[in-house]
């Protein structure tokens, strides 16, 4: 029986060959796609591997950047301080629009071919995500420190990362970037942006997306918990009380 991985690899290879045959006909053309259209989160979901692939015109000495961004969410960064030998949360910053997943892939270190100003213009990198704190006012230095702290936290959880050398280009036309989605990703639409860079300038750009969706019993529980949170909470309390009563009754009998 042919494995799923082998089928995906075969399909991707054939698609790459087809794209490569068309690429020379178009100047500064960039075409990208993903090996999967949807990632299903089931009860036994343990992450997923997929492949971003495509073709670009005359990129022998050029660079490719792939930005893989998940749905935005509200997230808090906390600063701990040691008081009387105990670490406690002293300060916190709540972010309105932090991406739940942010992985960058590039042919080499982005700082080798894009200056900080160019990265800012292209909105590349976690420092240029336009993160908005709910705190009314933060000095620039303080804001940067909080952004660095948020990045460290998300990197530790495998949700943000920068893969220098994560994109390979073959014969100046075909490119590919393996992508690994961890088990703790959120459902939603994941946007992919691919940039073709030459001498620090954007030559071409393409976008695609993939949906991550819960399936099966886990999807039903997730929808109930989010759409009917009050009833879900009451049911959880009632279930806990009933389970406790049954356990107590069983112990009394023994």
Residue ranges and their predicted role:
Residues 180, 203-233:
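Short, aromatic-rich amphipathic segments at membrane interfaces
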Residues 88-182:
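Membrane-proximal low-complexity regions enriched in glycine and acidic/polar residues
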Residues 51-57, 178-180:
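Short edge beta-strand/loop segments characteristic of extracellular beta-sandwich folds
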Residues 22-27:
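Sec/Tat signal peptide C-region and signal peptidase I cleavage site
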Residues 184-214:
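Extended, hydrophilic extramembrane loops/domains of integral membrane proteins
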Residues 28-45:
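N-terminal edge beta-strand
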Residues 9-21:
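Bacterial N-terminal signal peptides
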Residues 240-254:
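Juxtamembrane interface at the cytosolic side of transmembrane helices
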């Amino acid at each position: 029986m042919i494995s799923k991985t082998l089928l995906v690899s075969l399909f991707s290879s054939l698609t790459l060959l087809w794209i490569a045959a068309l690429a020379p006909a178009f100047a500064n053309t960039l075409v990208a796609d993903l090996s999967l259209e949807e990632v299903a989160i089931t009860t036994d979901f343990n992450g997923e591997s997929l492949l971003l692939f495509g073709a670009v015109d005359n990129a022998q000495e050029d660079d490719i950047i792939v930005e893989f961004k998940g749905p935005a969410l509200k997230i808090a960064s906390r600063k701990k301080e040691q008081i009387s030998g105990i670490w406690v949360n002293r300060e916190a910053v709540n972010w309105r629009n932090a991406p739940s997943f942010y992985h960058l892939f590039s042919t080499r270190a982005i700082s080798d071919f894009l200056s900080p100003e160019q990265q800012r213009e292209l909105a590349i990198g976690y420092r240029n995500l336009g993160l908005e704190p709910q705190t009314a006012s933060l000095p620039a230095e303080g804001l940067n420190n909080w952004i660095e702290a948020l990045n460290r936290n998300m990197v530790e959880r495998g949700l943000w990362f920068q893969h220098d050398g994560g994109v390979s280009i073959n014969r100046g036309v075909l490119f590919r970037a393996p992508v690994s989605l961890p088990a703790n990703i959120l459902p939603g639409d994941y946007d992919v942006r691919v940039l073709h860079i030459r001498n620090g300038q954007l030559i071409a750009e393409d976008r695609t997306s993939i949906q991550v969706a819960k399936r099966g019993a886990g999807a039903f529980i997730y929808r109930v918990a989010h759409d009917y949170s009050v009833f879900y909470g009451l049911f959880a309390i009632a279930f806990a009380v009933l389970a406790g009563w049954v356990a107590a009754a069983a112990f009394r009998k023994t």
